[in-house]
């Protein structure tokens, strides 16, 4: 069983640290090396590898500094994105072994064209593809690509823990509560999130089961969501419902 802890970075990023019982660890999307090195020193951990989901600087900015401290680091990342320092390129369907656990690589284009996610041990590290109550902006991909990527993630077991890369839950809730005003699960989740954030507690990880109840981008087949975007969508297909929802959120 692997343990996961968050390392906050910048304003709202989470760098995820995965470690085993023998004080060896992996970090996911280290945009900044400084907080990572601090945790490694404080907890006497040895860094073995880095997992990268996509090429944006707030996810890769710490690679070079971490490699200076750990020259033999294996840096795993998407094959189709220009990321300096990658030593193991991966794509959809590949596997990465971490401390005896096999993690599957999932291609999830949308936020960026080469974006990947890693799933194993009941945990999904999905970068900026799926957030709690939200999804990533389409900087490079199309609505159809992101829609299919989210469907791929939604097909994972409901108990899968969702480790996204940003603390966006409160702002995402503000939009979701407009998009689906009568969803009782959203009302309850808002109360939970407000309490957690007031206490300085992270809302991540979420679970896939929870997201299917509250995340409008995973609920595009629901009549309540279709009704909300009816004046913004070109038709009532699930894909166009998603596209209209994403356009709405971009300008919310």
Curated annotation (Swiss-Prot):
Pathway as given in its UniProt record: Secondary metabolite metabolism; methylglyoxal degradation; (R)-lactate from methylglyoxal: step 2/2
UniProt-annotated binding residues for Zn(2+) 1: 54, 56, 111, 128
Names of the cofactor(s): Zn(2+)
InterPro entries per the UniProt record, alphabetical: Clx_II_MBL, Glyoxalase_II_hydrolase, HAGH_C, Hydroxyacylglutathione_Hdrlase, Metallo-B-lactamas, RibonucZ/Hydroxyglut_hydro
GO molecular function (one): hydroxyacylglutathione hydrolase activity
Positions with a binding annotation for Zn(2+) 2: 58-59, 128, 166
Ribosomal protein is among the record's keywords: no
Domain of life: Bacteria
Reaction(s) catalysed (UniProt annotation): an S-(2-hydroxyacyl)glutathione + H2O = a 2-hydroxy carboxylate + glutathione + H(+)
Cofactor detail note: Binds 2 Zn(2+) ions per subunit.
Gene3D superfamilies linked to this entry: Ribonuclease Z/Hydroxyacylglutathione hydrolase-like
Keywords: Hydrolase, Metal-binding, Zinc
EC code: 3.1.2.6
Quaternary structure and interacting proteins, as annotated: Monomer.
Function: Thiolesterase that catalyzes the hydrolysis of S-D-lactoyl-glutathione to form glutathione and D-lactic acid.
Family: Belongs to the metallo-beta-lactamase superfamily. Glyoxalase II family.
Name of the protein described by the UniProt record: Hydroxyacylglutathione hydrolase
Organism of origin: Photobacterium profundum (strain SS9)
Source species taxonomy: Bacteria, Pseudomonadati, Pseudomonadota, Gammaproteobacteria, Vibrionales
């Amino acid at each position: 069983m692997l343990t996961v802890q968050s390392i906050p970075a910048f304003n709202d990023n989470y760098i995820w640290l995965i470690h085993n019982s023998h004080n060896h660890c992996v970090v996911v999307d280290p945009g900044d090396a400084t907080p990572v090195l601090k945790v490694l020193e404080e907890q006497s951990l040895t860094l073995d590898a880095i997992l990268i989901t996509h090429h944006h600087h707030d996810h890769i900015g710490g690679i070079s500094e971490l490699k200076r401290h750990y020259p033999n680091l294996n840096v795993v990342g998407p094959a189709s994105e220009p990321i300096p320092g990658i030593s193991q390129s991966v794509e959809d369907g590949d596997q990465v072994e971490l401390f005896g656990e096999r993690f599957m690589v999932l291609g999830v284009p949308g936020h960026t064209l080469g974006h990947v996610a890693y799933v194993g041990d009941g945990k999904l590290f999905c970068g900026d593809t799926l957030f709690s109550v939200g999804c990533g902006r389409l900087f490079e991909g199309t609505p159809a690509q992101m829609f299919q990527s989210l469907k791929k993630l939604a097909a994972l077991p409901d108990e899968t823990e969702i480790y996204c890369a940003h603390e966006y839950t409160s702002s995402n809730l503000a939009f979701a509560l407009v998009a689906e005003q009568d969803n009782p699960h959203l009302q309850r989740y808002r109360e939970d999130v407000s309490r957690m954030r007031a206490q300085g507690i992270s809302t991540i990880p979420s679970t896939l089961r929870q997201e299917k109840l509250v995340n409008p981008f995973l609920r595009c087949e629901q009549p309540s969501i279709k009704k909300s975007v009816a004046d913004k969508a070109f038709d009532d297909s699930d894909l166009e419902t998603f596209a209209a929802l994403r356009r709405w959120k971009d300008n919310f």
